[in-house]
Amino acid sequence: MRILKVRVQNINSLKGNWSINFEDPAYAAGGLFAICGPTGAGKSSLLDAICIALYGSTPRLGYLTGSTNEAMTRGTGIMESEVTFLAKGVRYRALYSQRRARNQADGRLQSANIELSRWNDEINNWEILEGKYKQKSEAK
């Protein structure tokens, strides 16, 4: 497996939207890179984001559930992690997102949306292979 892109929103110290494109020539040319920075810069948060998208858990925080999410940045109402990767020549995208009610920091934690997609060249779009979504109730 080769990680191609990582997109993060509000995971631990990585508040806001962040993305890294490992297909960028700056990364591709060297073949090797390091994750470095001062304490609190987001090095572990970046690795957490990758684990969350792929597995729904991290080694240091455990599984995220509908009642607990230690990875969501404090004071925010939504978190998301997306990893695009290549496995056996096929491009996949793993996505994990979770929000609080009304997208407010004090809202109740909602069920996570989890998705695994494969790139389909024929339709030039992502094809969902597996997904778990919070269903919105219909108005009566």
Protein language model features and the residues they cover:
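Extreme N-terminal "head/tail" segments of very large remodeling/mechanoenzyme assemblies
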Residues: 1-140
